[in-house]
Amino acid sequence: MRHSLTKLLAASGRDFPSRRDSREPPATRAPPREPSGAAAGAETPRPGSPDREQPHGDGDGGEPEARSGSRGSVAVRAPAPSPLKMEEEEEDAIAMVPKEEPEDMDFLSGLELADLLDPRQPDWHLEPGLSSPGPLSSSGGGSESGGLLRGDDDDDTAAAEMQRFSDLLQRLLNGIGGCSSGGDRGGGEKRRRKSPGAGGGGANDGNQAATKSPRKAAAAAARLNRLKKKEYVMGLESRVRGLAAENQELRAENRELGKRVQALQEESRYLRAVLANETGLARLLSRLSGVGLRLTTSLFRDSPAGDHDYALPVGKQPPEPREEDDAAGGVCLHVDKDKVSVEFCSACARKASSSLKM
């Protein structure tokens, strides 16, 4: 930014001397008057005191006469200065007094927008030997007795003015930024004043969110626990159903095995009774052999499928087993034509013993 401002000032400095020279020819340029003399001359006249003006005219009578003699020996008396002219002279004298210029934008009043935005000069480049001009006069540079004119050869003064100008622009930019930020802050304060409940509402919303967040977490944890418990109970129920079905199967098998064991116990008791009645059975069977009949038995033979097996457990629950002394030890003698078969059947033995007891 500083470089661009330097370019603008350099461009304005190119046109400024030519414009100033065109307005004021070098031949007619008057040298600057002494500040002390101008101030003294400005203080002596007063608008409403004609008595004081007369001595001033008498005292300086020799000088007008000398000037009139040099111009053509015509004696012309200088007219009395008007109050307006005297005030202008006072202002010019005060302006001619060297003083420190305020750091403001008054020295930019001589610049014109057309000079800065001239389309014929799209690019301004500083030449090696070109120096920036001094500050313009406060009166726009139109009058000969305007501001303090400085020469182009005063490079140090021009550099100091350029530094001052850049510092002033920087402060102006900082002031504009501060004003804008202050305006934003003021607008924010106004908005907060217009809506006083907005800040409290935001705080309340934050508090509510802070209080709701633990509740939400607790609710989520409770829901998760309920889901876990439900899944665990469902697993237990399915396991109980499976175990119940297996238990029923095992109970049925156990009943069948119990029946089988009971039948085997009865058969073993029957066989023990047969062995105990071996002598009587042997005599009977020996007599049958003399008749000429062939004796067979199925004791050592597997019964075919569908054949009645008296050793298998019956459907009804058998009575309590008797003691070995009361066990029936008879055999079944089957006679079919010329065939006689001896069968060992506990059921037939029980029936025979029960019929004998009757």
UniProtKB/Swiss-Prot annotation:
Pfam annotation, one family: bZIP_1
Motif interval(s): HCFC1-binding motif (HBM): 307-310
GO cellular component terms, semicolon-separated: mitochondrion; nucleoplasm; nucleus; RNA polymerase II transcription regulator complex
Positions where Phosphoserine occurs in the chain: 49
Chain positions covered by the region annotation Leucine-zipper: 236-271
Domain (bZIP): residue spans on this chain: 208-271
Positions of the UniProt region annotated as Disordered: 1-92, 119-163, 176-218
Listed Low complexity bias regions: 127-138, 205-218
GO BP: negative regulation of DNA-templated transcription; negative regulation of gene expression, epigenetic; positive regulation of transcription by RNA polymerase II; regulation of DNA-binding transcription factor activity; response to virus
Protein name: CREB/ATF bZIP transcription factor
Gene: Crebzf
